[in-house]
Protein backbone atom coordinates (compact mmCIF):
# COMPACT_ATOMS: atom_id res chain seq x y z
CA UNK A 1 0.00 0.00 0.00
CA UNK A 2 1.09 3.62 -0.55
CA UNK A 3 2.59 5.61 2.31
CA UNK A 4 0.21 8.54 2.77
CA UNK A 5 1.10 11.97 4.07
CA UNK A 6 -1.23 13.73 6.48
CA UNK A 7 -3.09 16.65 4.89
CA UNK A 8 -0.84 19.11 6.77
CA UNK A 9 2.28 17.29 5.58
CA UNK A 10 0.95 17.30 2.03
CA UNK A 11 0.41 21.07 2.24
CA UNK A 12 4.03 21.50 3.34
CA UNK A 13 5.13 19.28 0.45
CA UNK A 14 3.19 21.44 -2.04
CA UNK A 15 4.64 24.66 -0.61
CA UNK A 16 8.13 23.19 -0.88
CA UNK A 17 7.44 22.49 -4.55
CA UNK A 18 6.38 26.00 -5.50
CA UNK A 19 2.60 25.87 -4.92
CA UNK A 20 1.31 28.60 -2.63
CA UNK A 21 -1.11 26.96 -0.23
CA UNK A 22 -2.28 27.70 3.31
CA UNK A 23 -5.40 28.05 5.39
CA UNK A 24 -8.44 25.93 6.11
CA UNK A 25 -10.16 26.60 2.76
CA UNK A 26 -7.25 25.30 0.71
CA UNK A 27 -6.78 22.42 3.12
CA UNK A 28 -10.42 21.47 2.54
CA UNK A 29 -9.79 21.53 -1.22
CA UNK A 30 -7.08 18.91 -0.80
CA UNK A 31 -9.47 16.78 1.21
CA UNK A 32 -12.12 17.19 -1.50
CA UNK A 33 -9.61 16.14 -4.16
CA UNK A 34 -8.72 13.02 -2.19
CA UNK A 35 -12.39 12.16 -1.78
CA UNK A 36 -12.91 12.65 -5.51
CA UNK A 37 -10.07 10.25 -6.28
CA UNK A 38 -11.47 7.69 -3.85
CA UNK A 39 -14.89 7.87 -5.52
CA UNK A 40 -13.26 7.37 -8.91
CA UNK A 41 -11.43 4.26 -7.74
CA UNK A 42 -14.61 2.85 -6.21
CA UNK A 43 -16.42 3.40 -9.51
CA UNK A 44 -13.66 1.82 -11.59
CA UNK A 45 -12.79 -1.20 -9.43
CA UNK A 46 -15.68 -3.48 -10.35
CA UNK A 47 -15.45 -2.72 -14.06
CA UNK A 48 -11.70 -3.39 -14.08
CA UNK A 49 -12.16 -6.76 -12.39
CA UNK A 50 -14.87 -7.71 -14.87
CA UNK A 51 -12.69 -6.80 -17.86
CA UNK A 52 -9.60 -8.57 -16.50
CA UNK A 53 -11.49 -11.79 -15.80
CA UNK A 54 -13.28 -11.76 -19.15
CA UNK A 55 -10.12 -11.11 -21.18
CA UNK A 56 -8.25 -13.89 -19.38
CA UNK A 57 -11.09 -16.33 -20.08
CA UNK A 58 -11.26 -15.40 -23.76
CA UNK A 59 -7.49 -15.74 -24.17
CA UNK A 60 -7.40 -19.01 -22.23
CA UNK A 61 -10.12 -20.57 -24.37
CA UNK A 62 -8.44 -19.47 -27.59
CA UNK A 63 -5.07 -20.86 -26.53
CA UNK A 64 -6.48 -24.20 -25.40
CA UNK A 65 -8.44 -24.53 -28.64
CA UNK A 66 -5.29 -23.78 -30.63
CA UNK A 67 -3.11 -26.37 -28.87
CA UNK A 68 -5.92 -28.87 -28.12
CA UNK A 69 -4.50 -29.29 -24.62
CA UNK A 70 -4.38 -27.72 -21.16
CA UNK A 71 -0.62 -28.30 -20.82
CA UNK A 72 1.60 -25.28 -20.28
CA UNK A 73 4.36 -27.07 -22.20
CA UNK A 74 2.11 -27.49 -25.21
CA UNK A 75 1.37 -23.77 -25.02
CA UNK A 76 5.08 -22.99 -25.05
CA UNK A 77 5.63 -25.27 -28.06
CA UNK A 78 2.58 -24.43 -30.15
CA UNK A 79 1.25 -21.00 -29.20
CA UNK A 80 4.29 -18.99 -28.08
CA UNK A 81 6.61 -17.40 -30.64
CA UNK A 82 10.11 -18.88 -30.70
CA UNK A 83 13.12 -19.25 -32.97
CA UNK A 84 11.81 -22.52 -34.39
CA UNK A 85 8.23 -21.53 -35.17
CA UNK A 86 8.93 -18.06 -36.57
CA UNK A 87 7.77 -17.54 -40.19
CA UNK A 88 10.51 -18.38 -42.74
CA UNK A 89 10.96 -14.75 -43.80
CA UNK A 90 11.58 -13.58 -40.21
CA UNK A 91 14.99 -11.86 -39.79
CA UNK A 92 17.54 -13.67 -37.65
CA UNK A 93 17.59 -11.02 -34.94
CA UNK A 94 13.80 -11.18 -34.59
CA UNK A 95 13.90 -14.97 -34.30
CA UNK A 96 16.40 -14.62 -31.47
CA UNK A 97 14.20 -11.98 -29.85
CA UNK A 98 11.24 -14.38 -29.99
CA UNK A 99 13.33 -17.07 -28.30
CA UNK A 100 14.57 -14.74 -25.56
CA UNK A 101 11.00 -13.57 -24.93
CA UNK A 102 9.93 -17.20 -24.63
CA UNK A 103 12.64 -17.86 -22.05
CA UNK A 104 11.58 -14.75 -20.12
CA UNK A 105 7.95 -15.86 -20.22
CA UNK A 106 8.81 -19.34 -18.94
CA UNK A 107 10.84 -17.82 -16.12
CA UNK A 108 8.09 -15.35 -15.23
CA UNK A 109 5.41 -18.05 -15.09
CA UNK A 110 7.64 -20.35 -13.05
CA UNK A 111 8.29 -17.51 -10.58
CA UNK A 112 4.54 -16.88 -10.31
CA UNK A 113 3.92 -20.55 -9.58
CA UNK A 114 6.70 -20.66 -6.96
CA UNK A 115 5.41 -17.49 -5.27
CA UNK A 116 1.86 -18.87 -5.18
CA UNK A 117 3.12 -22.15 -3.70
CA UNK A 118 5.10 -20.32 -0.99
CA UNK A 119 1.96 -18.39 -0.09
CA UNK A 120 0.06 -21.71 0.05
CA UNK A 121 -2.35 -20.64 -2.66
CA UNK A 122 -4.69 -23.66 -3.02
CA UNK A 123 -5.01 -23.04 -6.77
CA UNK A 124 -1.37 -24.15 -7.03
CA UNK A 125 -0.61 -26.28 -3.96
CA UNK A 126 -3.38 -28.67 -4.98
CA UNK A 127 -1.36 -29.81 -7.99
CA UNK A 128 1.96 -30.19 -6.18
CA UNK A 129 0.69 -31.77 -2.98
CA UNK A 130 -1.37 -34.44 -4.74
CA UNK A 131 0.46 -37.58 -5.86
CA UNK A 132 -1.63 -38.08 -8.99
CA UNK A 133 -0.77 -34.65 -10.47
CA UNK A 134 2.57 -33.68 -11.96
CA UNK A 135 1.76 -30.51 -13.93
CA UNK A 136 -0.18 -27.31 -13.28
CA UNK A 137 -2.73 -26.83 -16.09
CA UNK A 138 -2.91 -23.59 -18.04
CA UNK A 139 -6.23 -22.58 -16.51
CA UNK A 140 -4.79 -22.69 -12.98
CA UNK A 141 -1.82 -20.59 -14.07
CA UNK A 142 -4.11 -17.97 -15.60
CA UNK A 143 -5.80 -17.59 -12.21
CA UNK A 144 -2.57 -16.45 -10.54
CA UNK A 145 -1.16 -14.23 -13.30
CA UNK A 146 -1.06 -10.53 -12.59
CA UNK A 147 -2.49 -8.32 -15.30
CA UNK A 148 1.04 -7.28 -16.25
CA UNK A 149 2.14 -10.91 -16.57
CA UNK A 150 -0.99 -11.63 -18.59
CA UNK A 151 -0.14 -8.79 -20.95
CA UNK A 152 3.39 -10.12 -21.38
CA UNK A 153 2.08 -13.61 -22.13
CA UNK A 154 -0.17 -12.15 -24.83
CA UNK A 155 2.79 -10.29 -26.33
CA UNK A 156 4.75 -13.56 -26.57
CA UNK A 157 2.04 -15.49 -28.41
CA UNK A 158 2.31 -16.09 -32.13
CA UNK A 159 0.65 -13.47 -34.28
CA UNK A 160 -1.86 -16.06 -35.45
CA UNK A 161 -2.98 -16.84 -31.88
CA UNK A 162 -3.11 -13.14 -30.97
CA UNK A 163 -5.28 -12.52 -34.01
CA UNK A 164 -7.72 -15.23 -32.92
CA UNK A 165 -7.90 -13.81 -29.41
CA UNK A 166 -8.39 -10.28 -30.77
CA UNK A 167 -11.21 -11.44 -33.02
CA UNK A 168 -12.85 -13.37 -30.19
CA UNK A 169 -12.79 -10.19 -28.10
CA UNK A 170 -14.12 -8.18 -31.04
CA UNK A 171 -11.25 -5.72 -31.47
CA UNK A 172 -11.18 -3.72 -34.69
CA UNK A 173 -8.01 -4.95 -36.41
CA UNK A 174 -8.17 -2.65 -39.44
CA UNK A 175 -5.25 -0.58 -38.13
CA UNK A 176 -3.52 -3.41 -36.27
CA UNK A 177 -1.64 -5.44 -38.89
CA UNK A 178 0.76 -6.92 -36.31
CA UNK A 179 -1.97 -7.77 -33.78
CA UNK A 180 -0.41 -5.75 -30.97
CA UNK A 181 -3.61 -4.08 -29.78
CA UNK A 182 -4.70 -6.90 -27.51
CA UNK A 183 -1.64 -6.79 -25.26
CA UNK A 184 -1.05 -3.04 -25.47
CA UNK A 185 -4.59 -2.34 -24.29
CA UNK A 186 -4.04 -4.83 -21.47
CA UNK A 187 -0.87 -2.94 -20.50
CA UNK A 188 -2.82 0.34 -20.48
CA UNK A 189 -5.55 -1.18 -18.32
CA UNK A 190 -2.90 -2.76 -16.10
CA UNK A 191 -1.55 0.67 -15.15
CA UNK A 192 -5.02 1.76 -14.04
CA UNK A 193 -5.78 -1.53 -12.31
CA UNK A 194 -2.53 -1.40 -10.32
CA UNK A 195 -3.15 2.19 -9.24
CA UNK A 196 -6.59 1.18 -7.97
CA UNK A 197 -5.26 -1.94 -6.23
CA UNK A 198 -2.45 -0.03 -4.49
CA UNK A 199 -4.68 2.95 -3.67
CA UNK A 200 -2.49 5.28 -5.72
CA UNK A 201 -3.76 8.48 -7.32
CA UNK A 202 -5.73 7.93 -10.54
CA UNK A 203 -7.50 11.20 -11.38
CA UNK A 204 -4.52 12.89 -13.06
CA UNK A 205 -3.28 9.74 -14.91
CA UNK A 206 0.18 9.90 -13.34
CA UNK A 207 -0.35 6.12 -13.31
CA UNK A 208 0.43 5.91 -17.04
CA UNK A 209 3.59 3.88 -17.71
CA UNK A 210 3.43 3.70 -21.52
CA UNK A 211 2.75 5.97 -24.47
CA UNK A 212 -0.21 4.81 -26.57
CA UNK A 213 0.70 3.40 -29.98
CA UNK A 214 -0.83 4.74 -33.18
CA UNK A 215 -3.07 1.64 -33.58
CA UNK A 216 -4.30 2.07 -29.97
CA UNK A 217 -5.43 5.61 -30.72
CA UNK A 218 -6.78 4.89 -34.19
CA UNK A 219 -8.89 1.96 -33.00
CA UNK A 220 -10.59 3.95 -30.25
CA UNK A 221 -11.06 7.01 -32.44
CA UNK A 222 -12.74 4.85 -35.07
CA UNK A 223 -14.82 2.66 -32.78
CA UNK A 224 -15.88 5.38 -30.35
CA UNK A 225 -16.13 8.15 -32.98
CA UNK A 226 -13.57 10.41 -31.35
CA UNK A 227 -11.51 13.20 -32.95
CA UNK A 228 -8.54 12.60 -30.65
CA UNK A 229 -7.31 10.50 -27.72
CA UNK A 230 -3.96 10.38 -25.92
CA UNK A 231 -4.53 8.74 -22.51
CA UNK A 232 -3.43 11.89 -20.70
CA UNK A 233 -6.77 12.38 -18.95
CA UNK A 234 -8.84 10.02 -16.83
CA UNK A 235 -11.65 10.52 -19.35
CA UNK A 236 -9.61 8.65 -21.97
CA UNK A 237 -9.33 5.66 -19.64
CA UNK A 238 -13.09 5.82 -19.07
CA UNK A 239 -13.51 5.64 -22.86
CA UNK A 240 -11.21 2.59 -23.03
CA UNK A 241 -13.18 0.87 -20.28
CA UNK A 242 -16.47 1.62 -22.05
CA UNK A 243 -15.06 0.22 -25.28
CA UNK A 244 -14.21 -3.07 -23.60
CA UNK A 245 -17.53 -3.21 -21.77
CA UNK A 246 -19.22 -2.83 -25.14
CA UNK A 247 -17.07 -5.60 -26.66
CA UNK A 248 -17.87 -7.86 -23.71
CA UNK A 249 -21.61 -7.42 -24.34
CA UNK A 250 -22.32 -5.48 -21.17
CA UNK A 251 -25.77 -3.93 -21.53
CA UNK A 252 -26.12 -0.38 -22.83
CA UNK A 253 -28.06 0.49 -19.69
CA UNK A 254 -25.17 -0.58 -17.45
CA UNK A 255 -22.59 1.28 -19.55
CA UNK A 256 -24.72 4.43 -19.55
CA UNK A 257 -25.15 4.18 -15.78
CA UNK A 258 -21.36 3.90 -15.42
CA UNK A 259 -20.85 7.02 -17.56
CA UNK A 260 -23.52 8.97 -15.65
CA UNK A 261 -21.86 8.14 -12.33
CA UNK A 262 -18.47 9.25 -13.67
CA UNK A 263 -20.01 12.51 -14.91
CA UNK A 264 -21.66 13.08 -11.53
CA UNK A 265 -18.36 12.59 -9.70
CA UNK A 266 -16.69 15.04 -12.10
CA UNK A 267 -19.54 17.54 -11.80
CA UNK A 268 -19.54 17.46 -8.00
CA UNK A 269 -15.83 18.28 -7.85
CA UNK A 270 -16.07 20.99 -10.51
CA UNK A 271 -18.89 22.63 -8.57
CA UNK A 272 -16.65 22.80 -5.50
CA UNK A 273 -13.73 24.15 -7.53
CA UNK A 274 -15.85 26.92 -9.04
CA UNK A 275 -16.91 28.02 -5.57
CA UNK A 276 -13.31 28.32 -4.41
CA UNK A 277 -12.30 30.09 -7.63
CA UNK A 278 -15.12 32.58 -7.06
CA UNK A 279 -13.83 33.43 -3.58
CA UNK A 280 -10.23 33.53 -4.80
CA UNK A 281 -8.67 30.69 -2.81
CA UNK A 282 -8.53 27.84 -5.33
CA UNK A 283 -5.37 25.75 -5.14
CA UNK A 284 -6.89 22.74 -6.89
CA UNK A 285 -6.32 24.28 -10.30
CA UNK A 286 -2.57 24.12 -9.63
CA UNK A 287 -2.81 20.53 -8.49
CA UNK A 288 -5.03 19.33 -11.33
CA UNK A 289 -3.49 21.48 -14.03
CA UNK A 290 -6.58 23.70 -14.44
CA UNK A 291 -10.03 23.49 -12.95
CA UNK A 292 -11.99 24.42 -16.04
Locate predicted features:
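Acidic/aromatic/glycine-rich contiguous surface patches that form carbohydrate-binding/processing clefts
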Residues: 199
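Extended intrinsically disordered or low-complexity regions, especially N/C-terminal cytosolic tails and loops
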Residues: 1-191, 203-292
Amino acid sequence: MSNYKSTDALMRHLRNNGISISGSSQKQQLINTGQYDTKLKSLLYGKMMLIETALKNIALNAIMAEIDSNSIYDMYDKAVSSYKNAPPETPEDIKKKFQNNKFNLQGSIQNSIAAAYRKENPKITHFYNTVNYNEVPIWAIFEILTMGDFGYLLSCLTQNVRRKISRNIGLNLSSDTNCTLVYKYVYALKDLRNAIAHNDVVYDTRLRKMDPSKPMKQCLMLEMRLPYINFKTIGDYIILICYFLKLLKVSKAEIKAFIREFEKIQSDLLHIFRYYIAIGVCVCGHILGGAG
